[in-house]
UniProtKB/Swiss-Prot annotation:
Gene name of the encoded protein: miaA
Name of the featured protein: tRNA dimethylallyltransferase
HAMAP family linked: IPP_trans (MF_00185)
Region feature Interaction with substrate tRNA, mapped onto this chain: 35-38
Binding site for ATP: G10, P11, T12, A13, S14, G15, K16, S17
Assembly, per entry: Monomer.
Length: 304
């Protein structure tokens, strides 16, 4: 029988990575990252990537697998994650941890994802037409997809049209779910709003003390300020500071604010899944509680 996949999810700064490491040590397991920015090399401090020592302690997968100038599609991530899970699931219970909802959903739900690689030339042509025109076009060629995509969401609109023009079939007809053939135990970490905000504040200060500004400066020097990843959370604010547009104090305040907003969106996403077992991130015996849940669920799996 295949061992269960253990999933740890929840809002940013809730302590997911720390719990995953502690649990991996206890279960003698491995960790698979489900973070859309930790896949990129050189983006370390601002993505809260596990330290070198932590990665030596426990094998981590799907970290540092792409150059900052490359892109990783959801389909590519899903394929890599599933390969790792299947290669270990007969020996240990792999731990999938992260806050990127779509990465987790692609694995847990077995999302069917069209295998269409990005088409830069087609995307440029579509972008030039304007979002209003594109959305109306999508409504005609794939009304089902258009109902699921916000009229202002240009990225998803263009992706849907891209799949349609490359395959000749609506993206909605190529989607769906193919649930995995192994059991899954989903664990959610969260805490009271004020407590999470304090965690976010502390982590932001720790990132700056650890050299976040210097990391951003090196990345700008090497790749230029127009690198898309430099417009993401934590990096965009420090880029503004380095450009002299805001003070370091303002950059820190903005990072905290934007991280709080991001955490709120993550909480909304994950709370929609009733199969997730939620735990208080500040619980004094968190590791023991989670371990007991896993043991109880494994007993149920064996009995069935």
């Amino acid at each position: 029988m295949k061992t269960p996949l253990i999933v740890i999810c929840g809002p940013t700064a809730s302590g997911k990575s720390g719990l995953a490491i502690d649990l991996s040590v206890r279960l003698n397991s491995i960790i698979i990252s489900a973070d859309s920015r930790q896949v990129y090399r050189e983006f370390d401090i601002g993505t809260a990537k596990p330290s070198i020592d932590e990665q030596k302690l426990i094998p981590h997968y799907l970290i540092d697998i792409c150059e900052p100038t490359e892109s990783l599609t959801l389909a590519q991530y899903q394929e890599k994650a599933q390969l790792i899970i299947h290669s270990f699931s007969s020996v240990v219970s792999p731990i999938l941890v992260g806050g990127t909802g779509l990465y987790l959903k692609s694995v847990v739900k077995g999302m069917k994802i069209p295998r269409v690689s990005p088409q830069p030339q087609l995307r440029s042509q579509l972008e030039a037409l304007g979002q209003s025109y594109l959305y109306n076009l999508l409504s005609q060629v794939d009304p089902i997809a258009s109902q699921k995509i916000h009229p202002h969401d240009q990225i998803r609109t263009i992706r849907a049209l891209e799949v349609f023009y490359v395959t000749g079939k609506p993206i909605s007809s190529q989607q769906g779910e193919n649930p995995p053939d192994y059991p899954i135990i989903q664990i959610g970490l969260d805490c009271e709003v004020n407590a999470l905000e304090k965690r976010i504040q502390q982590r932001t200060e720790q990132m700056i003390e650890s050299g976040l500004v210097e990391e951003v400066e090196k990345l700008i020097d090497k790749y230029g300020e127009n690198l898309p990843l430099l417009d993401t959370l934590g990096y965009a604010e420090m880029k503004q500071y380095l450009a002299g547009k805001i003070s370091l104090s303002e950059a820190k305040e903005l990072t905290v604010l934007h991280t709080r907003q991001f955490a709120k969106r993550q909480r909304t996403w994950f709370r929609a899944y009733p199969e997730i077992h939620w735990f208080d991130a500040n619980a004094p015996h968190l590791l023991d509680q989670v371990t007991q849940l896993i043991r109880d669920n494994c007993s149920l799996i064996v009995s069935h």
